[in-house]
Amino acid sequence: MAEAPARRPFFRRRKTCPFSGPNAPKIDYKDSKLLMRYVSERGKIVPSRITAVSAKKQRELARAIKRARFLGLLPYVIR
C-alpha cells in the first residue's frame, strides 16, 4: 500500500514592522492621520500582534496616541 506524501505545514510569514527601515514614517503625536491607522473603530489602540509593530515602536506609538488624545488631536472614544 502506497503512503500519501507528507504535507508541509502551513507557515505564515511574519510581517515586518512598518516603522523600521530606511524610509519608514516617524511616529509623531501631531500626525493624527498616521495614528488613526493604529486605533480601532471604537477608539482603542490596536495590539501589535495585529499591526505587526515591534515592541519598542508599539510603546512609542501608544505614548504618541495618548499624547494626541490629551491635547485633543484624537478622540478618546469614537461612537
From Swiss-Prot:
InterPro entries associated with the record: Ribosomal_bS18 (IPR001648), Ribosomal_bS18_CS (IPR018275), Ribosomal_bS18_sf (IPR036870)
Q: Which GO terms describe its molecular function?
A: small ribosomal subunit rRNA binding; structural constituent of ribosome
Keywords for this entry?
A: Ribonucleoprotein, Ribosomal protein, RNA-binding, rRNA-binding
Short name of any one Pfam family annotated for the protein: Ribosomal_S18
Q: Does the keyword Transport apply?
A: no
As for family, the record states:
Belongs to the bacterial ribosomal protein bS18 family.
Role noted for this protein: Binds as a heterodimer with protein bS6 to the central domain of the 16S rRNA, where it helps stabilize the platform of the 30S subunit.
Name recorded for this polypeptide? Small ribosomal subunit protein bS18
UniProt source species = Bradyrhizobium sp. (strain ORS 278)
